[in-house]
Amino acid sequence: MNILLCSINTQKGLYDISGVEVGQHLYWQIGGFQVHAQVLITSWVVIAILLGSAIIAVRNPQTIPTDGQNFFEYVLEFIRDVSKTQIGEEYGPWVPFIGTMFLFIFVSNWSGALLPWKIIQLPHGELAAPTNDINTTVALALLTSVAYFYAGLSKKGLSYFGKYIQPTPILLPINILEDFTKPLSLSFRLFGNILADELVVVVLVSLVPLVVPIPVMFLGLFTSGIQALIFATLAAAYIGESMEGHH
């Protein structure tokens, strides 16, 4: 009887733990759905920054490029190089996808350090970089998964699934598991790095004067850019792999 009661109490404790949330969150009720408002607000801000910057820089292209036009042309060339290196000669149609991923993640990561999110008061929780939330990183990783499945199926048809039994059918479970671990690694790597970076800065600011955490903030900006590049590079590599075959 005591063992049964202990088991019931243990299960109840695990159930209670499963309902715990880290921090407070603001939610909107839209129809019958509960929407995470903080992520939507910060994501809209990042999208507005990207669209506004692009429109201002290239709304009137010049034969002799302006500084803004030069910058965006350099970014485009950089994204093309990354896409071509990872995907191959058929990289062209995927440049917009890889570029969108890279720029959204890059600006999102930097917004956590450069934008004064804390000034905006919310009824519950506080604003932070979109990539500081697991919902955003999982969504980006799932989009990448859909993209490389689409790339493989559109080029090879149903024969695409033949890669799962190459080089031997014995590897079928491992090859299937690999496709599940790709979005997991993409999402948790990005989420963990951005969350850890912001937590370190917050702790240092609370413990020491403002001047001391500044080098850490610059290091965070650097690593944030690297994380955006890693995500975009891996996304392009997965797409290239699905189009060329299993490696």
From Swiss-Prot:
What is the similarity comment for this entry? Belongs to the ATPase A chain family.
Physiological role:
Key component of the proton channel; it plays a direct role in the translocation of protons across the membrane.
Major subcellular location class:
plastid
Q: Does the keyword Ion transport apply?
A: yes
Q: Does the keyword Repressor apply?
A: no
Please state what the protein is called: ATP synthase subunit a, chloroplastic
Q: How does it sit in the membrane?
A: Multi-pass membrane protein
The record describes its quaternary structure and partners as:
F-type ATPases have 2 components, CF(1) - the catalytic core - and CF(0) - the membrane proton channel. CF(1) has five subunits: alpha(3), beta(3), gamma(1), delta(1), epsilon(1). CF(0) has four main subunits: a, b, b' and c.
- Which Gene Ontology terms of cellular component type are present? chloroplast thylakoid membrane; plasma membrane; proton-transporting ATP synthase complex
Chain segments annotated as transmembrane: 38-58, 95-115, 134-154, 199-219, 220-240
Cystine pairs annotated here are none
Record's subcellular location: Plastid, Chloroplast thylakoid membrane
